[in-house]
A protein has these predicted regions:
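A feature for loop-to-transmembrane-helix boundaries and adjacent hydrophobic helices
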Residues: 1-342
Length: 342
């Protein structure tokens, strides 16, 4: 199988892009390694954010580890469930975790449920925990999406855009080669290539953009859960458009409707209005607080002008004990007493 990947419009040609490598006789898929690297960097960022917020870093580390394990299993189950037409004929392939076959939405769903249960048990706020965790999750997603590059996955329809990606037709599953791709096959050095949109790249850049947005907003959030809901709405918005372009998508059984397309639309439709409404309400509350504070300060200034403080009045002279002794008459030496004594 030809192992090259080309971006001719960008002047990039990778003659050898392996799917895996070996160390001491053990084979590791690059897809899995990149997901692991993204997860580790994401968890590192989460623990740093927890420390910045004065939270227990160990609690967040425990939560992320549990959620990660559950999300990996959940993403695989989700993928198998919506690809059952293939797996029911290949049951042994269900446990083949090395060659991809994971659904991100399944991982997010199961991972967030695990985090919610963890917060319930530890009696901590799920919304605050999610706010702290979601930038790290986005960082992990941005890195992990490059695993699709090495697996020749997550690509779109034929395109002649300058950043189009060329993949040997022999390197992808036959069911993912559309009629438009076959009509526009390119033969280079005797090798047939399909020319497609790099959806994995779009999503990686989108996740990076959302990551930067949340990092900029984390000091300015108005309420617990705001960053988390922006993450859900923002990711849903981007993923909705990417799913329209994507070829290798998961469909709702018996339909031609992509399950990720539906989930993305729901996330955006539900959480974006909530984000906007709660942000407007929070700003109104802040405005009311500022007005009340200004009114209080203005009234305080007015009272000072009408009723000056005692400290600003001229102080009365202090009568010291020695002054009392000087003023007080000497009874024993008074003239009246002298006459009586005489």
């Amino acid at each position: 199988m030809e192992m090259s990947i080309r971006f001719p419009g960008l002047g990039l040609v990778f003659d050898y892009v392996p799917r895996s490598f070996q160390i001491f006789g053990m084979e590791f898929t690059i897809y899995g390694v990149l997901i692991a690297v993204g997860a580790l960097l994401g968890m590192g960022l989460v623990t740093l954010e927890a420390k910045r917020n004065g939270e227990d870093q160990n609690r967040y580390l425990d939560m992320m580890l549990i959620s990660l394990l559950v999300s990996v299993a959940g993403s695989r189950l989700f993928y198998v469930a919506f690809s059952w037409g293939f797996y029911k004929e290949n049951l042994n392939a269900i446990l083949d975790f090395r060659n991809g076959g994971y659904a991100l939405y399944g991982g997010l769903l199961f991972g967030f449920l695990a985090a919610a249960v963890f917060c319930r048990i530890t009696k901590t706020s799920f919304w605050q925990s999610a706010d702290i965790a979601c930038p790290g999750i986005l960082l992990g997603q941005a890195i992990g999406r490059w695993g699709n590059f090495f697996n020749r996955e997550s690509f779109g329809e034929y395109t002649d855009l300058p950043w189009a990606m060329q993949i040997p037709v022999s390197a992808v599953r036959s069911g993912e080669v559309s009629g438009a791709m076959r009509d526009n096959l390119l033969t280079i050095n005797g090798i047939s290539y399909i020319q497609v949109q790099p959806i994995f790249l779009y999503e990686s850049l989108w996740c990076l953009l959302l990551f930067l947005l949340l990092m900029a907003m984390r000091r300015k959030k108005k309420y617990e859960g705001e960053l988390f809901m922006i993450y859900l709405a923002g990711y849903g918005l981007g993923r909705f458009f990417f799913e329209w372009l994507r070829i290798d998508k998961l469909y709702i059984p018996g339909t031609k409707v992509g399950i990720s397309l539906v989930i993305s639309a729901i996330l955006f439709a539900v959480f974006m209005p909530v984000v906007i409404i709660r942000r407007v309400m929070a700003q109104k509350r802040d405005t009311i607080r500022r007005q009340r504070r200004k009114r209080f300060l203005d009234e305080s200034v007015k009272e000072k002008k009408m009723f000056p403080e005692t400290s600003e009045m001229k102080p009365e002279p202090e009568i010291r004990p020695e002054m009392d002794e000087q003023v007080k008459p000497d009874v024993g030496n008074s003239p009246t007493n002298s006459k009586e004594e005489q």
